[in-house]
Amino acid sequence: MTTALTSHSNQLPDMPGINVLLMGPAGTGKTHSIGTAVDAGVELFGNSSLEVFYLGLEPGLESLKGYWTDAGKPIPPNIHWHSIKAPDIGFADMIDAAKMINTLSLDSLAKMQDAKRSKHNQFIAILEALANFPDDRTGEKFGAVNTWGSDRMLVIDGMAGLNRASLAMVVGGKPVKSQSDWGIAQDQVEKILRKICEDCKCHFILLGHVERETDQILGGVKIMISTLGKALAPKIPAMFSDVILTVRQGTKWTWDTSNSQADLKTRNLPIAADNPPDFAPVLKKWLARARAE
């Protein structure tokens, strides 16, 4: 069953939602903070509420659920989730691949094609989920993401899973990747992000890890989103309204929008190193601007 857009979508301003890239090292609270968006969706959007759809490409659902369960609270009804399954690759397949690596020359490995590449279909599963989002929680389907309004939010967790799925779609389990393989995979990741950021009106949050990359324009090294190769990372921030660095110092978690060593930007938060890890101010600022005449 596909659930149509609810009637309350017309009560919200007809303005595209926020596009937020939340990036940082592991353990800095990226997935956990999605709970603040769910809660803010109830507090700020009133009776209409903001429905949040979490697409898990990496292990993270446990952390998201823990935002409520660890505090002894029920999981709100406005959060939906779907987890993409890992490729159906067994240890026997890994043994076969290891034997080829152990016996074939580098040139032979580079020329080989993975006969089991069709098993690496995660990227296709991601697109299918975006074409008609299936809720693992209720069994309902909620239609294509590009038909949603600003009463809905898509969360993709995270960029590393998207990277792996795209590259595996191109090469399968082939151990040696050519420059063309990397280029095709990068192009697919860029296309899916541009489609969501530029052609969808729903709110969008992308979670990702970071790495240090050379700034090809200004020189030097900057903290950027971890993605395929070096050419794609500098293109990604321009697609988003906010690019935020997640930070943990001891037992304190913050969002940094001012770090000059990172490729950051913000439209909906103060430029500061110690913003609280909370989506409520971001959504509140968006609502104020969207309702302005």
What residues fall within each predicted segment?
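C-terminal regions of RecA-like/P-loop NTPase motor modules
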Residues: 1-7, 14-18, 253-293
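Conserved, well-folded catalytic cores of nucleic-acid-processing
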Residues: 40, 129-133, 162-165, 199, ...
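Amphipathic coiled-coil/heptad-repeat helices and related helical stalk/stem segments
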Residues: 5-6, 30, 189, 229
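Conserved P-loop
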Residues: 10-138, 143, 147-150, 161
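Hydrophobic alpha-helical membrane-insertion segments
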Residues: 65, 166-167, 250
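P-loop NTPase motor core
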Residues: 143-235
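Phosphate-binding/switch region of NTP-binding enzymes
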Residues: 199-278
